[in-house]
Amino acid sequence: MDNKSNGKLIALAIGGAVLMGTLFFLVSFLTGYSPAPNHSAILTPLRSFMGWFLLIFCASLIIMGLGKMSGAISDKWFLSFPLSIFVIVMVMFFSLRFYWEKGRTTTVDGKYIRSVEQLNDFLNKPAATSDLPPVPADFDFAAAEKLTDAKCNKCHTLGSVADLFRTKYKKTGQVKLIVKRMQGFPGANISDDEVIEIGTWLQEKF
């Protein structure tokens, strides 16, 4: 395969990637696409376009490379073939690694989360607001824990809903709201004072 044919294949890969990316870019507006409030209406779909471009272009290069290798197998194929695959995979890995340096999860204050450690740190930070009163200095956490275990583990254990509780209610300062919902279930037998006691323990210790 000569250099002219190689140029045509590369041009075809780039042209196909641009065409597909443009198609998805336009369809995103036709389907009523609404970008995130902290991104512009053009920048967000443009990032999606770049993702599709890299995906299709790298896939085209892989197909071209495998085709060339299949036509040039020699007595050294056992060495060239795995090395070529390794190089292709590493190029894709580092291109995606360095291009998407900001991560995929964005907090409301514009920061990015890239790792599990960063996610855990974010979830463990106290909420900015709370629907519970301040914790009294003489609050009995041991008694509140026993009360919570007795009242809040009837239908299911707290551990089974821990992630949902921490992300949807505790992180948004709505612990009292979820305890009030539990109070409304038949047979809950949770008084208004116990709502505060249970909510305080969940907010501070769970």
Swiss-Prot record:
InterPro entries in alphabetical order: Cyt_c-like_dom_sf (IPR036909), Cytochrome-c551 (IPR019604)
PTM field: Binds 1 heme group per subunit.
GO BP annotation list: photosynthesis
Keywords: Cell inner membrane, Cell membrane, Electron transport, Heme, Iron, Membrane, Metal-binding, Photosynthesis, Reaction center, Transmembrane, Transmembrane helix, Transport
Gene Ontology terms for molecular function: electron transfer activity; heme binding; metal ion binding
Record's subunit section: Component of the photosynthetic reaction center. The reaction center interacts with the Fenna-Matthews-Olson (FMO, fmoA) complex.
Name the UniProt record assigns to this protein: Photosynthetic reaction center cytochrome c-551
Organism per entry: Chlorobaculum parvum (strain DSM 263 / NCIMB 8327)
